[in-house]
From Swiss-Prot:
Family classification: Belongs to the metallo-dependent hydrolases superfamily. Adenine deaminase family.
Protein name as annotated: Adenine deaminase
The protein's required cofactors: Mn(2+)
One GO term of the biological process aspect: adenine catabolic process
Keywords annotated in UniProt: Hydrolase, Manganese
EC code(s) of this entry: 3.5.4.2
């Protein structure tokens, strides 16, 4: 680390000093003494080892770093604790935490995360390429390594939704030349790739030509020809796998299988048996979070939580650590830069007293002690977010309860219903026979109203449908401008007037999530940046977000982390049934369908 600029020197600029420190001819900046070295290259623990660090990089790992200790060297006594490489999240979306990159970094550093690969396709759908640049700019300022993937699909499914700012193949090619861009974000338009869509293939080709990694997203159980065509199209990984067979299929075809444990996704347990029971080589299995709520980050952890979960599922702790360090680094071609405690790599080290429960006691990132016993010790710099990023909710008019009415004739109607599945991203395509009163289809039982309100161009458009699985009761509504992936406004409720009140409230405050009951506000978390993020500290955002969760529960919701489920109801690239600004989407067939059956 350059003490004057705070920036990590490239290895080539640090090489000569690393040699001198390793040889004991020059003092190190930092020495960790007397630790148990977790070597992820050999999958072994070697006791009685020291680590010497210079210019933010590991210079020496061996039994005696004494010759590298000078008057100005910071010495940390490991006292027999394990020295673990800093943890890596190989696939995630910063915006899901309702935080900017600075806020996210501040939240996860105390949990031992020192590297993040993030795909800002949420803000890309609202602000386009400029939104990506802003996320990249703030990421580069952080004391940990935050690599940005250029979003590939905005909109995620052309013809099935309308985004705020579409991303073009020319913009993808342009971004591949930016500092901090490590590859292409998840290629969600898997039918497009499999059918040879020119734009999708051009984006992938531009990424591969730049020598960078293509993120995958094949959200279909079909492992036949469409799957093989998608793999042949160039995607390098996939995090949408939910079963052992799906994960194995990816790895057999040369992809990385990214097993996720987010706030609402619990896909590790069902896939890790490929390693723990079938004994497959774990090199191409990688751990990630995908989407983590701010409350999860503050209260439960980040990648340390994922590693612990993998161990609880029967995984060898050393294998679990490999899947959250060297496997991820290797996947992105960065194994010579990070992912292990070895010479030349970024000095990202965790000190912990137990590999199974993984308490994070000391965190070192790029040679700097950044956290100690859960306390952040460094600043996470922020950019000045422009006014355009803070003025992104345009409803065009004030909404009324009548806007959320589904009109029909007769005594009852059979309608399509989006069935939410707890702890899973996919939904079920259900139907229900609902009563008609005064010409309006009324929800009953488990079924609620759902509506998508256009918020990018101020058209005043509202698309209505029905959803089940939340368990809501009474006269209530939840509204959110976090609505993957095009991020219009999603409103779910049992009462149309409460739905209108909630939607109008978010229009006034510039975005966020709110819960109304009997027409009155119960809880709100304001997200003024693109309607997706707050620039407040993580703990403050988490507290407000917890208020949302509690308000949902007070309205009868029984789902685990219902907010995350709520935010995905418009995600038209994950089966089976979704809602968009263009209508109801059958994702299994990738086509718009009538609400009425």
């Amino acid at each position: 680390m350059n003490k004057e600029t705070g920036m990590l020197k490239p290895w080539i600029e640090a090489q000569a000093r690393l040699v001198e420190v390793a040889a004991g001819r020059a003092p190190a900046d930092l020495v960790i003494r007397g630790g148990q070295w977790v070597n992820v290259h050999t999958r072994e623990v070697i006791p009685g080892m020291d680590v010497a660090v210079a210019d933010g990089r590991v210079a020496y790992v061996g039994p005696d770093a004494g010759p590298s200790v000078g008057p100005g060297t910071q010495v940390i006594e490991a006292d027999g604790r394990f020295m673990v490489p800093g943890l890596i999240d190989a696939h995630m979306h910063v915006e899901s935490g309702m935080l900017t990159p600075a806020g996210f970094a501040a939240a996860v550093i105390p949990h031992g995360t020192t590297t993040i690969f993030h795909d800002p396709h949420e803000i890309a759908n609202v602000l386009g390429l400029e939104g990506v640049r802003l996320m990249r700019d703030e990421s580069l300022l952080q004391p940990i390594s935050m690599f940005t993937q250029m979003p590939s699909c905005a909109p995620s499914a052309p013809g099935l939704e309308t985004t705020g700012q579409p991303i073009t193949e020319g913009e993808v090619a342009q971004a591949m030349g930016w500092d901090g861009i490590v590859g292409l974000g998840e290629m969600m338009n898997f039918p497009g790739v499999a059918s040879g869509d020119r734009q999708m293939l051009t984006e992938i080709a531009a990424t591969r030509a730049a020598g960078k990694t293509v993120g995958g997203h094949y959200a279909s159980p079909d492992l036949g020809r469409p799957f093989h065509a998608y793999v042949a199209g160039g995607a390098n990984d996939d995090h949408e796998t939910t079963t052992e067979a799906q994960g194995i299929a990816r790895v057999r075809q040369g992809m990385g299988c990214m097993m996720r444990l987010g706030s609402a996704w619990y896909d590790v347990e069902s896939q890790i048996t490929a390693i723990t029971e079938k004994g497959l080589d774990p090199r191409f299995f990688i751990l990630c979070t995908d989407d983590s709520h701010s409350g999860t980050l503050v209260n439960d952890g980040h990648m340390n939580r994922v590693v612990r979960h993998a161990v609880d599922c029967g995984c060898d702790p050393l294998v679990a650590i490999q899947m959250a360090t060297i496997n991820a680094a290797s996947h992105f071609g960065l194994e010579r830069e990070l992912g292990s405690i070895t010479p030349g790599r970024r000095a990202d080290v965790i000190l912990t007293s137990d590999l199974r429960s993984l308490p994070i006691e000391t965190v070192i990132a790029q040679g700097v002690v950044v956290a100690e016993t859960g306390k952040l010790l460094v600043d996470c710099p922020r950019i000045a977010w422009p006014e355009a990023a803070r003025d992104s909710v345009h409803l065009g008019r004030s909404l009324t309860g009548a806007d959320f009415a589904v009109r029909a004739t007769g005594d009852s109607a059979r309608v399509r219903v989006i069935g939410v599945v707890e702890n899973q991203a996919p939904t079920r395509a259900l139907t229900a026979q609902l009563p008609i009163r005064d010409g309006v289809v009324e929800p009953q039982g488990e079924t609620c109203h759902i509506a998508l309100v256009e918020r990018h161009r101020g058209t005043g458009g509202v698309v209505n449908g029905f959803v089940s699985g939340f368990g809501y009761q009474g006269r209530m509504a939840v509204a959110s401008t976090v609505a993957h992936d095009s991020h219009h406004m999603i409103v779910v409720g049992t009462d149309r007037d409460s739905m209108a009140a909630a939607a109008n409230h978010l229009g006034r405050i510039g975005g966020g999530v709110t819960v109304f009951r009997d027409g009155e506000e119960l809880a709100t978390v304001a997200l003024p940046i693109a309607g997706l993020m707050s620039d407040r500290p993580a703990a403050e955002v988490a507290e407000a977000a917890q208020g949302i969760v509690k308000a949902m529960q007070d309205c009868g919701c029984t789902l685990n982390n219902a907010y995350m489920q709520h935010s995905l109801l418009a995600l038209v690239v994950i089966p089976e049934l979704r809602i968009s600004d263009l209508g109801i989407v059958d994702v299994t067939r990738f086509e718009l369908v009538d609400l009425m059956v």
